[in-house]
Amino acid sequence: MIYYLLRYINDLFDLPGLHVIEYLTFRASAAAITALLITLFVGPGFIKYLKTRFIEPVKEEAPPEHKKKNKLPTMGGLLIIFSIEISVLLWSKFIDPHVWLIMLAILWMGIIGFIDDYRKVVLKIKGGLSARYKLIGQVTLGLVVGCYTWYDPSFSVLLSTTTVPFFKYLTIDYGYFYIPIVIFIITAVSNAVNLTDGLDGLAAGSSAIVVMGLGGFSYLAGNAVYAVYLNIPFIPGGGEIAVVSMAIVMACVGFLWFNSNPAEIIMGDTGSLALGSAIAVIALLIKQELLLPLIAGIFFLETLSVSLQVLYFKYTKMRYGQGKRIFLMAPLHHHFQLKGWAEQKIVIRFWILTILFFLASLMTLKLR
């Protein structure tokens, strides 16, 4: 909105200094600062309101240390989503299809998460929204993103082709499997972030690091010179994704002001599903979805721990008549909680791992 306003004024009067609005780095920085300030200023009043209505009960099977979170308001993801949407509307070329596809993903999965949180907190329905309806919501989003990027001419440059990390000339063409793969990636990543949201600051901090990395890739992919030099797909208009990415990063950082241990608020499924879908769609749009197991490695490990736990339990129960577990509790962060690690230590160590995964993903730009 500000972008179009200043551009209109500049076209009329050609005022000195207004050309800066055309620079991606300026608008990405402005979007980041705006998202941070909105979160910090709106946060206190928003938390006060949520405390009167939306207190999420802690699960009975949660670790003992988790029981003290029984009075925390949930649906904090609404604050993240609001900050992102406003800053992106102000500073991005929001009519760009890359931008509104990401915004659509955040809003849609935010609504799915809100319904889930509302059913748990207000209607007192144990488990919230059933897994079936969550899956329907995720598949619907995947169909929209997949079909739009498949059929819209503005995405026809690469269409169903993607690159393989660490290989200079190796590409994969999904062909008619493209749309099912888009559905799978959006579903998997949104669920992975949702599983990770179990400790104060863990999901928000990890998401900020991952999106910062993807934002860097977006900036490079949107510049023809950098893309050719680094041998990554050139995405016309893809640089706008960097503006959105920085808004997401700083909205998460602002949320950490209130969500760091001891948390005043938790994001709930409203935030975790929205952030997960944003990560997935950004990666898909810049053709770096095969990099997700590395750059979003912490989410991958959390999901893997749950999958292994369930599969091993079912196998041992079928084989020996009694189910056994690999971990004390899944997801992985709860395993370390039950081993006696302090919550802050787990979160910071997981952040460190996420930074290492981020740096390793940057190395793929040259290790080809």
Swiss-Prot record:
Primary location group: membrane
So which cofactors does this thing need? Mg(2+)
Q: Where in the cell is it found?
A: Cell inner membrane
Q: Which domain of life is it from?
A: Bacteria
Report the GO molecular function annotations.
metal ion binding; phospho-N-acetylmuramoyl-pentapeptide-transferase activity; UDP-N-acetylmuramoyl-L-alanyl-D-glutamyl-meso-2,6-diaminopimelyl-D-alanyl-D-alanine:undecaprenyl-phosphate transferase activity
- EC no. given is 2.7.8.13
What reaction does this catalyse?
UDP-N-acetyl-alpha-D-muramoyl-L-alanyl-gamma-D-glutamyl-meso-2,6-diaminopimeloyl-D-alanyl-D-alanine + di-trans,octa-cis-undecaprenyl phosphate = di-trans,octa-cis-undecaprenyl diphospho-N-acetyl-alpha-D-muramoyl-L-alanyl-D-glutamyl-meso-2,6-diaminopimeloyl-D-alanyl-D-alanine + UMP
Q: Which InterPro entries match?
A: Glycosyl_transferase_4, PNAcMuramoyl-5peptid_Trfase, PNAcMuramoyl-5peptid_Trfase_CS
Q: Which GO terms describe its biological process?
A: cell division; cell wall organization; peptidoglycan biosynthetic process; regulation of cell shape
Transmembrane regions listed in the UniProt entry = 30-50, 72-92, 95-115, 139-159, 169-189, 208-228, 238-258, 264-286, 345-365
Give the residue range of the signal peptide. none
Of which family is this protein a member? Belongs to the glycosyltransferase 4 family. MraY subfamily.
Q: What does this protein do?
A: Catalyzes the initial step of the lipid cycle reactions in the biosynthesis of the cell wall peptidoglycan: transfers peptidoglycan precursor phospho-MurNAc-pentapeptide from UDP-MurNAc-pentapeptide onto the lipid carrier undecaprenyl phosphate, yielding undecaprenyl-pyrophosphoryl-MurNAc-pentapeptide, known as lipid I.
Q: What is this protein called?
A: Phospho-N-acetylmuramoyl-pentapeptide-transferase
Q: Which organism is it from?
A: Pelodictyon phaeoclathratiforme (strain DSM 5477 / BU-1)
Q: What is the lineage of its organism?
A: Bacteria, Pseudomonadati, Chlorobiota, Chlorobiia, Chlorobiales
